[in-house]
């Protein structure tokens, strides 16, 4: 019995020594052995089918391999698939960081605080967005793209040529930008082109509201119930009106202007008379002082 025990103990010691020697000769840790197995399996992996954990279908390799390659990638040159030149890392890394990003604080390049995701994700979602249905924040139904894309295109747009939908040739920017600037505009001070101080909004907004305005009910400032349009539109049409031919409603062929303009001039004259008295009546042949409105 004692002999059998000693013999079995000797065999166990020999086996441990033998396997340890083999491992020392190969000098390969267990984790690297697994990596070697994965590398041998790469050609057999179907990117569209079930994948082993840690495998990226975009790059056709494992994440650990990609991370080791980061310092060698040139952002301005050819890049491996799934690499973002804006962030200097792969999309899969960025997606894992999303919950940690503060929209109101410092943000990594390429991150949109409006959508809470990276631009590259949003661009992939464009074909799935319904312009007439619920839309993700920062998406413009007029242009069919996100505002951040449109802002990058501004220098390339020709104001006098074909323009993308939602672009204002008067302001050289998109309507959505102008609407965000409304609270900062001073009606009595310098105003951006296309802004109406009477209505406190841009002309393009007012034109879209025309079908909803009731001529007999409350009307927005600057709207003429006679013409069914705003005064600023009518003033632009003055040179095209023929006094002797058909005329738009509210136009006076005697004065060559609209009645609403004349009423505003009467009000200014009345204010002048109240402040300075009646303009003096001059004798024939004398030069009278010219009245200048307020």
Curated annotation (Swiss-Prot):
Q: Which InterPro entries match?
A: Bradykinin
Q: What's the domain of life for this entry?
A: Eukaryota
* Residue pairs linked by disulfide bridges in the UniProt entry: 282-288
Pfam families reported for this sequence = Bradykinin
Q: Which residues form the signal peptide?
A: 1-23
Question: Where found?
Answer: Secreted
Q: Under what name is this protein listed?
A: Kininogen-1a
Organism, as annotated: Bombina maxima
């Amino acid at each position: 019995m004692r002999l059998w025990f000693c013999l079995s103990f000797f065999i166990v010691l020999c086996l441990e020594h033998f396997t340890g020697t083999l491992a020392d000769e190969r000098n390969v840790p267990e984790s690297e052995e697994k990596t070697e197995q994965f590398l041998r399996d790469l050609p057999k992996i179907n990117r569209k089918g079930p994948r082993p954990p840690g495998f990226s279908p975009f790059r056709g390799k494992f994440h650990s391999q990609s991370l080791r390659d980061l310092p060698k990638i040139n952002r301005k040159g050819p890049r491996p698939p799934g690499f973002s030149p804006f962030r200097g890392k792969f999309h899969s890394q960025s997606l894992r960081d999303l919950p940690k990003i503060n929209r109101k604080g410092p943000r990594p390049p390429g991150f949109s605080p409006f959508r809470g995701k990276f631009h590259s994700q949003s661009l992939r979602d464009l074909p799935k967005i319904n312009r007439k249905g619920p839309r993700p924040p920062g998406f413009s139904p007029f242009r069919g793209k996100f505002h951040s894309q449109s802002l990058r295109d501004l220098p390339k747009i020709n104001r006098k040529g074909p323009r993308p939908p939602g672009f204002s040739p008067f302001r050289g920017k998109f309507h959505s930008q102008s609407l965000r600037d409304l609270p900062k505009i001073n009606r009595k001070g310098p105003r951006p082109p296309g802004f109406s101080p009477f209505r406190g909004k841009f002309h393009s907004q007012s034109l879209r509201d025309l079908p909803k305005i009731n001529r007999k009910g409350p009307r927005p400032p600057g709207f003429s119930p006679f013409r069914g349009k705003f005064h600023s539109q009518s003033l632009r049409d003055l040179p095209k009106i023929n006094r002797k031919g058909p005329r738009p409603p509210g136009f006076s062929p005697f004065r060559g202007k609209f009645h609403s303009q004349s009423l505003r001039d009467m009000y200014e004259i009345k204010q002048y008379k109240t402040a300075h008295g009646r303009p003096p009546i001059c004798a024939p042949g004398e030069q009278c002082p010219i009245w200048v409105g307020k």
